[in-house]
Amino acid sequence: MGTAAEALNNIDGTPCKEFYVADIERQGEQAMLWDILQEADEDRYVCTMSIDSNARSNEDTIKEFGLCDFHSYTLMQSVSVKLHPNGKKRRYLLQLRNPWGKKEWLGPWSDYSKTWETYPYVHE
């Protein structure tokens, strides 16, 4: 089984990079990951994301939130939002598309999540 990066490269020669969040977190470089995603989004790169097939320890959480393992999602946009108009606290949100269209994110910040009501300023 290959990766989305390998598929894109095989189809049209698109240069691809792969990043593993677990590796970045171990290095304490979470801000670097956000910078990479922002730059890729701004430059209109094709970005895909997937859940590591070795994430068995998180299998229940994956299913609870409506995600699929062994499956690629497309990054539609990445945004950094303030939780309150005058506050400094931010959240980094990713809008992903499931090409299958059969399952949907059910966790915080999902389409019908109460989180939007808790932080109405973000929706604006």
Predicted segments with their positions:
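Accessory/interaction modules and long regulatory regions
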Residues: 1-124
